[in-house]
Amino acid sequence: MKKLKIAGYQGDGSVHTRSVKFFINKVSNYFNISFDQDITEKGKKAASLIEMTMNNEIQISYLWSSYYEKYIPEIKLLDLPFYFKNKNEVKSLINNDLQAYVSIELIEKNNLKLLGFWDNGSRHISTNNNIIKNPKSCENLKIRTTPSPLHIDVFNELGFIS
C-alpha cells in the first residue's frame, strides 16, 4: 500500500482538521496514511507546509491562500479587503477563472497540485471592549491578521496595530 503523509496547522476542534480526517476516512483503504495535524506544536510555522510539500516530505497539506502570494502573486485577489459583495461573487471568480489559473501555476512552477479551494469563512472585525462604528473606533486596537502584506497594510491604515 502506498504511503501518504498529510500535515496541517490546526488542533482537533478546527474545521480544517475535521475535514482532513474526513478525507482520510474516505481514502484510507487505498493508502497507508500518517497525519501530523498541527506542525506548529513542534515549532514549525504553518507557511513551511508549502516547502514541505514541494520537497515531498509530505504529500498533502492545506493553507490559507495568503501563504501562496510569493508563488502566485495573483492569488492576492482573494485577499482584497471589502472588495467582494458576497460569497457567490468569490465562488464565481474561483470557479470560472482563478482555480484553473492557480492550478497551472502551481504545477508548472512549483511542483504542487491544487486539489481545490474551500470556504474558510467570512472575516469579521469585532472586539470585546468597544463597538467598532467607524475607522476612528479602530485606532490603536491590536488585530490579528492573515500573513498577507495587503491585509496588514490596510488594517494599519485604518488605525489598527497589526
Regions found by a protein language model. Give the residues of each.
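Contiguous mixed-secondary-structure segments that line small-molecule binding/active-site clefts
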Residues: 51, 56-60, 64-162
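Acidic helix-start/capping segments at beta-turn-to-alpha-helix junctions
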Residues: 37-45, 49
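Short, well-ordered beta-strand elements
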Residues: 1-16, 20-24, 31-37, 140-145
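Hydrophobic alpha-helical packing residues
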Residues: 27-28, 155
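Generic non-transmembrane alpha-helix signal with a bias for helix starts/N-cap capping motifs
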Residues: 20-21, 46, 100, 148
